[in-house]
Amino acid sequence: MAEFKRYLELDISQQHDFIYPLIFQEYIYALAHDRGLNRSIFLENAGYDNKSSLLIVKRLITHLITQMYQQNHFFFSVSDSNQKKNLGYNTNFYSQMIFEGFAVVMEIPFYLRLLSFLEGKERVKSHNLRSIHSIFPFLEDKFTYQNYVLDIQIPHPIHPEILVQTLRYWVKDASSLHLLRFFLHEYPIWNSLITQKKSIFYFSKKNQRFFLFLYNFHVCEYESIFVFLRNQSSYLRSISSETFLERISFYRKIEREVFTKDFKAILWLFKEPFLHYVRYRGKAILASKGTSLLMNKWKYYLLNFWQSYFYMWSQPRRIHINQLSNHSLDFLGYLSSVRLKPLMLRSQMIENSFLIENASKKFDTLMPITTMILSLYKAKFCNVVGHPMSKPAWAALSDSDIIERFRALYRNLSHYYSGSLKKISLYRIKYILRLSCARTLARKHKSTVRAFLKRLGVGLLEEFFTEEEQVFYLTFQKVSFTSGELYRRRIWYLDIICINDLANYE
């Protein structure tokens, strides 16, 4: 950490919490293009060129601020098709360069806090917990004994000014915050960053680092209430939560604390020790062993927290209270539920025998076949009721490329839904993709499916017998299972780190 600070010359800047001067350091832009805070950052020759010269950066920022005050808008307009050149330079190109460097600078205070937190602690070298599938064993272990869940949709992005005010807790440098305001005014699409897929796709190609930083910070602020509650109550302490960057208190714009004065008066509402929280992207789940009254209090508390701290109206319908015993949880593409499994026990006492009816809770994960067919329909693999269709967009490819694309798609789906308790839904998806592949090939060769398969043989579609299906037999070949038990086995993989939209699959 000392080497990191010395390389970035942070000791002097940190004396007054200044990070704005780092924007004028040329190696920041080399670091931005290196795409990481831990790749080649200690090399003496960072590999940057004279395009990121200090003089250019100073002139552009000065001109940016002047234009902002004179014309009341950014002159670096993304939608400006003319792309005028000022100061002898392409302003759109250099504004993008400053944007990328600024994203690195804004990450530094958080990165230093993380390094400080990890100092003296043993790092976990395993990356297994990065997998999305690692959530489901946790749900199976913890949620089986819970009664109610809060199904939470994190509210839409807040006003940019509120975001800046919230960021002041972590970043004390006023100059950097002013520059952040300029960038947020330049990109008004921030308000649709989370809710509209087109905006996410747009930012994935341009300014990805900066907007992912804002998105993660935005969501992290919503989650920080749970860490705050844990610190205030001994009932809510949890070892796993110490990985969060913790806040001490929450503030309004006016100079008074929101929760600390009246906190003891309302803390009794949440003395339930069995609380479990998981989140993926904009959807979160809070489970409790308590009653519906307790969950209603949690819902009321979260709504009031969002409204008082973020100055925004959060609709109550974004939080749903569901009972696990009679509700399926739609999370991460699976339908998860807790059902009672009846169990009959025979007890023998001397000459008498008794039948004891018992029931145990079991956590089920199922593949939502209706949702999957709708996704395949949107991607033009089948019609709305699940009848396979040809894929015209792929008909121009070679036969091997067409087969490989369909095979790769099914392999990915079977890989992800290997945790489904019943495989019949997955077999139906396999049928749709196999026949869609055959119809695409027949369309390309201007033939019917029957004539095409008769000419080339049905063995052509055996390519769809993927290694995923062989895993079941290779894994459990030494264990005695009936066919029904093997059919219901679940496998969770530890290499799945993201979910892509099927409609955008190419």
UniProtKB/Swiss-Prot annotation:
Residue ranges annotated as coiled coil are none
| Molecular function in Gene Ontology | RNA binding
Q: Where is this protein primarily located?
A: plastid
**Stored InterPro entries:** Domain_X, Maturase_MatK, Maturase_MatK_N
> What are the subcellular locations of this protein?
Plastid, Chloroplast
| Single Gene Ontology BP annotation | RNA splicing
- Gene Ontology cellular component annotations, sorted alphabetically: chloroplast
Q: What keywords sit in the KW lines?
A: Chloroplast, mRNA processing, Plastid, RNA-binding, tRNA processing
Describe the family membership recorded for this protein in Swiss-Prot or TrEMBL.
Belongs to the intron maturase 2 family. MatK subfamily.
- HAMAP family given in the database record: MatK
Q: What does this protein do?
A: Usually encoded in the trnK tRNA gene intron. Probably assists in splicing its own and other chloroplast group II introns.
Q: Which PANTHER family match?
A: MATURASE K
List the protein's name.
Answer: Maturase K
Source organism per entry reads Phyllodoce empetriformis (Pink mountainheath)
Write the gene name.
matK
